[in-house]
């Protein structure tokens, strides 16, 4: 795997066309770049499923029937605009294809044999089991972005922190370390040579028009999952977010789409590490009272507005996926549980998200939340890295590029229990 560098990448100025998602290329351009690649990754049957849900929020899906065993075969995404939904669905297929092991270079060794300065201690990945001394694992080289920081660079939040990360911010001299392949590939198969450290997952996977874009999306997901895991463990959702009249029209319109269809939405700003905001959304379809439509969505972004929009879009995507029957075979037991529990009981079981006590929690206006996002992807990455330096000794990026830029971001110590309940951090945050 090649050494990762961070170079200058300006975001497109077509925010109005794309709704909210400012990439280095517009969503329309991105979709056109991605479409010819679908044959290369075995993706077929790209179509729209917007009409399955009364919301009318654009949703597209594409199938990848030859995905590795244990990997996702259906890739569904929603968007503010059709172009955004198309690009997100196609990019998701590329992301998951890229995460599958395809004769990538690996080392087979023990942590002790590789050396403490050359490899990450697997225990820092919040393992569900103890690691035997001398236990042999598969390892891959990954780039540690934190190693490229100038030690004189102030942290974000200090007087000079934000200004020190300029549009010319780059990282070109980062160190490499070995990290367990189990944390990189998904699905992960130890090929009969080693035991799994944990069940592999998709947390921290990202793809984009550029490596920087892929890293930003992956980095955001890792921070989001850390915040969501901590919130679920502590049962503290932070502050309820109010979408006030000063919020951008695109966000107000999106929220109104749910409300006019008889769907209640609650938004929270979860306690998160570093700059930016993790927004969680809970969707209560009190019109149909369908327990399967009690869904949540969450997203982290430097821009609070973008985080809120992405959380709502994830709710729309999950509703459409369930209506499309994507989980029917995989989660037959869960479907049966939902049917037996019913709407009211399921709300009580998930009272943290849907309980009446939430009405009494502290609130904040979306327009009053700090927005340190910039017009440059590289600068946004720099701001995030600078702001989490107290929480993250390492930020690893493994290059998974196959047909277009794709990465896996791994931040040791960041929580993951919302994805894998067996991996619970035992120390305080």
Show the residue positions of the predicted features.
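Helix-biased "structured C-terminal domain" signature
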Residues: 1-429
